[in-house]
């Protein structure tokens, strides 16, 4: 079991979540949060091919599906997180960002809160960016150097 398996097992557990049981749910609340965070509107992903790089339990995969994505490929290094993601995306895979080969076929690529957890953030960014097709969109979130606040809506 990897460190991330342990983390996701803990984070998705009843004891950790307490009153925040909906933190990783698949609901309209997640869709609205995704729209707010990305600026994507209700029809913004219609017919698009998307990638959720470092998908965790799949809350953003779900949002992309609900916003009309034709296909969402999802992967994460944690087998624990992938178990949950497969509830909404049976094709979700366990894998590392560092295994990505240049493959610019995605209209929209998301990597939320993932890149800075890798041994080489710049290389991780390059690997993820290599998946975006011409005129596609790459949306990432990384902590800044002074990250000292709780993320509102996370």
Regions from the language model: what does each represent?
Residues 1-44, 48-54, 137-154:
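Conserved class I S-adenosyl-L-methionine
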Residues 57-98:
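Class I SAM-dependent methyltransferase SAM/SAH-binding core
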Residues 99-104:
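Short conserved loop adjoining the S-adenosyl-L-methionine
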Residues 110:
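A conserved beta-strand element that flanks and buttresses the S-adenosyl-L-methionine
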Residues 113-114:
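Short catalytic micro-motifs in class I SAM-dependent methyltransferases
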Residues 122-134:
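A short glycine-rich, Lys/Arg-flanked "PGG" loop and its adjoining helix->strand segment in the class I
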């Amino acid at each position: 079991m990897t460190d991330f398996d342990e983390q996701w097992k803990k984070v998705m557990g009843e004891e950790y979540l307490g009153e925040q049981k909906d933190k990783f749910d698949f609901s309209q609340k997640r869709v609205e949060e995704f729209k707010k965070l990305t600026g994507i509107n209700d029809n913004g992903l219609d017919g698009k091919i998307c990638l959720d790089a470092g998908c965790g339990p799949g809350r953003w995969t779900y949002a992309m599906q609900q916003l009309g994505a034709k296909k969402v490929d999802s992967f994460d290094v944690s087998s624990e997180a992938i178990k949950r993601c497969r509830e909404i995306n049976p094709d979700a895979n366990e894998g590392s960002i560092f295994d990505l080969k240049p493959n610019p076929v995605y209209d929209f690529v998301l990597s939320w809160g993932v890149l800075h957890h890798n041994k080489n953030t710049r290389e991780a960014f390059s690997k993820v960016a290599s998946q975006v097709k011409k005129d596609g969109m790459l949306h990432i979130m990384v902590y800044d150097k002074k990250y000292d606040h709780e993320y509102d809506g996370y």
